[in-house]
Amino acid sequence: ILYKAQEDSTDVYYFAGDARNNWVRFGGYYWRIIRTNSDGSVRLLYHGTSTTATDAYIKSDVKHKFCWSENSQGVCQNDDPMYVGYMYGISGSLENNRLNTNNSTIKIAIDTWYKDNMIPYTKYLSTTAIYCNDRSIVSGQYNLGNSTFTFGAQYRLQQNNVPSYDCGSDAKGSWFDTKQSSSDMFTTPNLNNVGNGKLTYPIALITADELVYAGGKMYANALNYIYYNSNNKSSTGVESIWTMTPISWFESAAVSFANTGSDNPGYLGIGSVNYSGSLRPVISIKKDLIYKSGDGSAENPYIIEAVPVNTYEVNLNVNSGSGTGTVLVEEGKDAKFTVAPNSGYKVELETNTCGGTLSGNSYTISNITSNKTCSISFKKNGTSLVTLIRANAVNENGYRYEGSD
């Protein structure tokens, strides 16, 4: 059975309960369909290499459990509200936290897994699907001390049991902030400027709201397809999985939602962000992909026509300007960046390590055939004699410049 809700005033359809017909085989892995997105793409939840997996979470060479953010010594942190961010900026205010200049540890882990396993399938994934890290404050005042404040999902899910697919929604048709915050709407860079464009790869985590739509309940066991594998066992064994959704700052500790394993089947609870949990990635396949075969069952999952394509990562560092970033480019195509000089610099290149071309604010590196790390710098504006005169410039003898030259 499919259910209907809305995202961005667009009808979307989702699976709930003990769904048995939402299995997909894509990119060499099994996935469960969560829902459609407002851009028409289809959101999938990772289920590993088998429909019977009891370890449907990603693993690195050394571990399979991750806290939200580690410091440079590898110590998990929860002593600042900014650590509920999938990305975060600097401390001191919500506005600062939402600058999204630093990757969380869980984002680094997910990005690493994607880079190692899914890069050739990037062309099939949506760049405009939104992955929500709702940091809207509902009650209390932002602080770094012992005073509690709560984020949007606490009001929606814990107080009212009214989930929403709209990031930052109060579930009443409006927003907790003055307007919807694009800083919490994670997307990859896209031509339509949807979301914040901060993701390097089109992958993230499930939200607590999506879990509730799927049949999850706050502080209660809930046996639904998120929990079950095709053998009606826990997809993650005893492991809990992190969602992308923060809940509160509580007595000097940052707290987020987690979904538990077989010890408390399907229980949607909370955990301090310095706890370690497992990660089940979420991706969104484009709406126009061609169905190849299957009926969605575990025995005969939907299979999408998706031939892996050589895809390369191009990193650009912009000195004396803005536009530093990373793009994924199919072999033989061009890498394009939007760049701009800082004040005092002009739209001309001083250095250009990869030989790209600059046209206005568009910088292009043609015919990508390998991974690249490139850098450019802009030329500094020269100081004219007129500017010196206007600034009352004098020479070493104390005389002002005079005349036309």
Where are these regions (language model features)?
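Short, solvent-exposed loop/edge segments of extracellular or virion-exposed proteins
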Residues: 311-330, 390-400
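Short proline/glycine- and polar residue-rich coil/turn motifs
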Residues: 329-331, 367-368
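Surface-exposed interfaces of beta-sheet-rich extracellular modules
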Residues: 333-364
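Conserved "repeat-terminator" motif of extracellular CCP/Sushi domains
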Residues: 308-316, 361-384, 388-390
